[in-house]
Amino acid sequence: FLKILLKPFLKESSKLTLRKIALINFYINKPITEDNKDEIAKQYDWKSGHKLYQHYSFYSSRANRLALPDPFTKKKYNNIIELFEKVIEHLPDNYKQKAIDEKKTIESKYNSENY
């Protein structure tokens, strides 16, 4: 009985966010376009790919991927680092290095900015 009540909650919490899906697809060199956005979203149990496409377009820019949050807060910074860590977990080994290097770049920026 408890399992039935928790099933929707468990499924929802295990679902990848659109930001994670966008970054994963970027790092595995699988472009998200206007033509395939809905198809890719459905593969991850999302109904629409509109926001996914927006996130992918944002993260396609190196400057956007490596930017510290503005305005800066420690919480936003930690959220970015956590996003990268989760994405790295989902990447095949042969695609991880670029994401790892970019995460280190963000951490270096943070350390050099004296926040």
What are these regions (language model features)?
Residues 49-66:
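Major-groove recognition helix of helix-turn-helix-like DNA-binding domains
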Residues 1-39, 43-46, 50, 68, ...:
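Acidic, serine/proline-rich, intrinsically disordered low-complexity segments
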Residues 62-81:
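Accessory, usually C-terminal, subdomains that scaffold auxiliary metal cofactors
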